[in-house]
């Protein structure tokens, strides 16, 4: 078996599209998100659906050619690890000055093209999200970057990572730290099934006349 072939789909993929698993000393399956744990590994497509299928169909034992113990909530365990990694990197980006929060500052970062990605708390009101989305569309219309937006965490978790309270909207700014955050948010979003592809939405509206009005 190719060492970068998903044990569920049997298809090869880039490592960023896969999650590596190894067997620990206690014969338990362990997710290796950093791909640096010793021992033989197997690979699963990097989304919850395929991880759950691998566990349910006993595919880990088949891949490792020995009986292994699969944690009952392996899918949830991987989700938690990805979320913790994303929030930890977000906190580091804040310390590096690469995050702003608050609707006004976020909108300004979008319109200036400084924002790399947007984070909305799960509790974010539709009106606040809509205003920032208008700014994103207008930025694309004027030839600026298409900025992705994610709604992956509740306000309490965003606030804890960013050292603030009532953090509903945040912008991660273009920088090395911002790129590291983006990589982890993309991985978490993919694992959870992916957000609606608003990049396509942004491209579709880029030529609309009313997009220019959003800038005003």
Where are these regions (language model features)?
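Short, solvent-exposed amphipathic alpha-helical segments in soluble enzyme
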Residues: 133-138, 186-187
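Extended interfacial segments that mediate partner engagement and assembly in macromolecular machines
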Residues: 49-128
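Arginine/glycine-rich "motif VI" loop of SF2 helicases in the C-terminal RecA-like domain
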Residues: 111, 136-145, 163
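N-terminal cysteine/histidine-rich coordination modules
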Residues: 1-66
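Charge-patterned, long linear interaction tracts outside catalytic cores
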Residues: 200-216
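Helical mechanochemical/support elements of P-loop NTPase systems and associated helical scaffolds
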Residues: 2, 41, 56, 82, ...
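Helix-rich interaction surfaces within compact, conserved domain-sized segments
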Residues: 149-203
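Conserved nucleotide-binding/hydrolysis micro-motifs of P-loop NTPases
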Residues: 12-13, 49-51, 123-126, 156-157, ...
């Amino acid at each position: 078996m190719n060492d970068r072939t998903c044990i569920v789909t049997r298809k090869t993929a880039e490592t960023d599209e896969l999650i590596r698993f190894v067997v620990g000393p206690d014969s338990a399956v362990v997710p290796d998100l950093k791909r640096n744990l010793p021992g033989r590994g197997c690979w699963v497509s990097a989304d919850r659906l395929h991880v759950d299928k691998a566990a349910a169909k006993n595919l880990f034992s088949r891949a490792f050619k020995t009986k292994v113990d699969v944690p009952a909530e392996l899918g949830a365990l991987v989700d938690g690890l990805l979320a913790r990694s994303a929030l930890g990197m977000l906190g580091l980006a804040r310390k590096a000055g690469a995050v702003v929060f608050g609707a006004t500052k976020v909108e300004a970062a979008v319109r200036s093209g400084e924002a790399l990605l947007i984070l909305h708390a799960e509790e974010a009101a539709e009106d606040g999200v809509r205003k920032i989305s208008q700014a994103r569309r207008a930025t694309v219309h004027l030839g600026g970057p298409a900025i992705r937006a994610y709604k992956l965490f509740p306000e309490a978790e965003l606030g804890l990572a960013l050292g603030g309270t009532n953090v509903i909207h945040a912008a991660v700014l273009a920088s090395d730290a911002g790129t590291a955050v983006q990589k982890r948010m993309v991985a978490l979003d993919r694992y959870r099934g992916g957000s609606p592809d608003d990049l396509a939405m942004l491209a579709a509206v880029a030529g609309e006349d009313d997009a220019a009005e959003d800038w005003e």
